[in-house]
Design a protein with these regions (language model features):
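FAD/FMN-dependent oxidoreductases across multiple families
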Residues: 219-293
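Glycine-rich FAD cofactor-binding loop and adjacent beta-loop-alpha segment at the N-terminus
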Residues: 17-82
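Conserved FAD-binding catalytic core of PHBH/FMO-like flavoproteins
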Residues: 151-235, 242-245
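N-terminal amphipathic/basic-hydrophobic helices that include classical n-h-c signal peptides
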Residues: 1-14
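Active-site flanking residues adjacent to catalytic metal/cofactor-binding acidic residues
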Residues: 20, 43, 149, 267-268, ...
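Short glycine-rich anion-binding loops that position phosphate/pyrophosphate groups of nucleotides
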Residues: 25, 153-156, 279
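Conserved N-terminal helical subregion
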Residues: 65, 78-175
Length: 294
């Protein structure tokens, strides 16, 4: 596992760490390290990532506590959920599971772009962090770094050293959007297992809810009106508007090699799972926790 293959080194004694990429994972990792007063150089290909404003992340209570304490306070960005209800395609006639814990917070939803912007702003003003566009001249200097952490699946380092992986394609595609609706007490997440695939309603405020629909057979996507499906399966909200749909392919992967010399693979480059489990970014936070404690 990652924990057993991380370099045998005390990271707090390293003078400088280089992080490749400026994804949400890369910035989260960088912020955790600069908080330990470790000098971090971030090398990236694209200066401005075009982050979808319809993408959201579910974060567990324990990971939120760690994030607030060790990385940055994200409480103002969170929408706390106290219950999860799971239905079959029959909806109210067949509720499969009901998760709740004495009216306490189970997990929280945060919008990707909001979290990204606050991390980017804090790192830009941090004396321990230096951001720079990656070019071929930087390749030779990577070997001189004490530790390089690669979070970018698209760069030349990935293609050269981290191309061997075990991949599972689901022939599925996730569609995301935000619905705007009348104001309600909105602290319950809904998951409906439709015939076409799971449909999630994830509250982000009292009048907005994030939608994630995973289409089981992507070849059939042209036959399905996803906006109509959302309206048909919705039994809770008085919808005013459905934002433009965005989508991405679903697959899982694990690298065969987690590191090369002084370069460590990290985040989605290292391992990726189906978002239905809700563990993608939660796994990343747990990996950051382990790495920071070495």
């Amino acid at each position: 596992t990652l924990y057993h293959l991380i370099f045998i080194v005390k990271i707090k004694n390293i003078m400088k760490v280089c992080i490749l990429g400026n994804s949400l994972t890369a910035l989260t990792l960088a912020k955790s390290l600069v908080n330990l007063k470790i000098n971090v150089e971030i090398l990236y290909i694209k200066k401005n990532l075009n982050l979808s404003k319809t993408r959201t992340i579910g974060i567990s209570k324990s990971n939120i506590d760690y994030f607030n304490k060790k990385i940055t306070n994200i409480n103002p960005l969170l929408w706390k959920l106290k219950k999860i209800e799971i239905f079959s395609d029959n909806l109210s006639r067949e509720k499969l599971v009901n998760f709740e814990k004495d009216n306490e917070q189970i997990f929280s939803i945060i919008q990707n772009h909001n979290l990204y912007e606050i991390l980017k702003k804090e790192l830009s003003n941090n004396k321990y962090c230096y951001l720079k566009i990656f070019n071929n001249n930087d390749l030779s200097s990577l070997k001189s770094k004490d530790l390089t952490i690669n979070c970018d699946p698209q760069n030349i380092i990935t293609k050269k050293y981290f191309s061997k992986k075990i991949t599972k394609k689901y022939n599925s595609r996730a569609f995301t959007t935000i619905i705007k609706h009348d104001k309600i007490t909105n602290n319950t997440a809904l998951q409906i297992f439709t015939r076409e695939g799971p449909l999630a309603f994830l509250p982000i405020s009292n009048n907005e809810t994030s939608i994630v629909f995973s289409l089981n057979n992507y070849r059939d996507h042209k036959k399905i009106n996803i906006e109509q499906l959302i309206k048909e399966k919705n039994f809770k909200y008085k919808i005013k508007k459905i934002d433009k749909l965005q989508s991405f392919d679903l697959h899982s992967l694990n690298l065969r090699s987690y590191y090369h010399d002084n370069i460590l693979a990290f985040g989605d480059l290292l391992h990726k799972i189906h978002p239905l489990a809700g563990q993608g970014f939660n796994m990343t936070i747990r990996d950051i926790k382990i790495l920071s404690n070495i």
